A protein has these predicted regions:
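Amphipathic alpha-helical packing segments from all-alpha helical-bundle domains
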Residues: 103-104, 120-147, 157-161, 188
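Amphipathic alpha-helical segments enriched in hydrophobic/aromatic and basic residues
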Residues: 28, 36-37, 58, 62-69, ...
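Amphipathic alpha-helical linker/stalk segments
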Residues: 65-94, 102
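Amphipathic C-terminal alpha-helical segment
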Residues: 100-101, 139-143, 160-181, 194-202
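Basic, helix-initiating cap at the start of DNA-binding domains
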Residues: 1-34, 38-43, 49, 59-60
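Short helix-capping/turn signature of helix-turn-helix
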Residues: 55, 113-119, 129
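Amphipathic alpha-helical segments that line or abut small-molecule/effector binding pockets
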Residues: 22, 88-110, 157, 161, ...
């Protein structure tokens, strides 16, 4: 066979774990934490035994769903090139990915926020899924401080939360009504406000 021959593409089927995570995402989006493992297993086309074999509990499955939700945001931070540090370019890219992710999963995020969860479960999910993402963002901003681009006296933990909060608020707002400005205009404003607030030379 010629080396230039284009191989036929095969589309791999989702694994059982992937099907369960997708089914859980859909069920949690509709029913919140009240969704049962039986409902999730049925939606994924597997039995409950398989669900428990792969994830042990509904709580661990919920954690896997949150991991899925934050994956794109984590990958966006992984793509940042610290050797070619350009804070405006990087923050614009990260803001867009964060907005797209929150918009894509807004039904899940709204429903989970509306349901009261066990505090220990919330703490575990934050520690295992959300905190690593925050730490990546904090490390990036710390590099900006090291380079003298970001104000040295800035506490980076609330800085990250303020940035993500602006974006999440926009997604929630657009779920209620459509503002007269575009999402692109809002994100550009968020980036300007953020950089003007944290940079030594905006």
């Amino acid at each position: 066979m010629s080396l230039l021959t284009t191989p036929s593409r095969t589309v791999s089927k989702p694994s059982t774990s992937e099907r369960l995570i997708q089914a859980a995402l859909e069920m949690f989006s509709v029913r919140g934490i009240a969704a049962t493992t039986r409902e999730i297993a049925d939606a994924a086309g597997v039995n409950e035994v398989t669900l428990f074999r792969l994830f042990e509990s509904k709580e661990r499955l919920l954690g896997a769903v949150v991991q899925e939700v934050v994956q794109a945001e984590s990958e966006a931070l992984d793509r940042v090139d610290l050797e070619d540090f350009d804070i405006r370019r990087d923050i614009v890219a990260v803001a867009q990915v964060f907005y797209d992710t929150h918009h894509r999963y807004q039904a899940f995020l709204r429903t989970i926020l509306a349901h009261r969860m066990n505090p220990k479960l919330t703490e575990e999910i934050v520690r295992e899924a959300v905190q690593p993402l925050r730490e990546k963002f904090i490390r990036y901003l710390a590099e900006g401080q090291r380079r003298g681009v970001i104000r040295e006296n800035l506490d980076l933990r609330p800085t990250v939360d303020a940035f993500t909060g602006m974006i999440f608020a926009a997604v929630l707002r657009r779920a209620v009504y459509t503002p007269v400005y575009t999402s692109e205009a809002y994100l550009a404003t968020c980036v300007d406000l953020f950089l003007n607030g944290i940079c030594t030379r905006p």
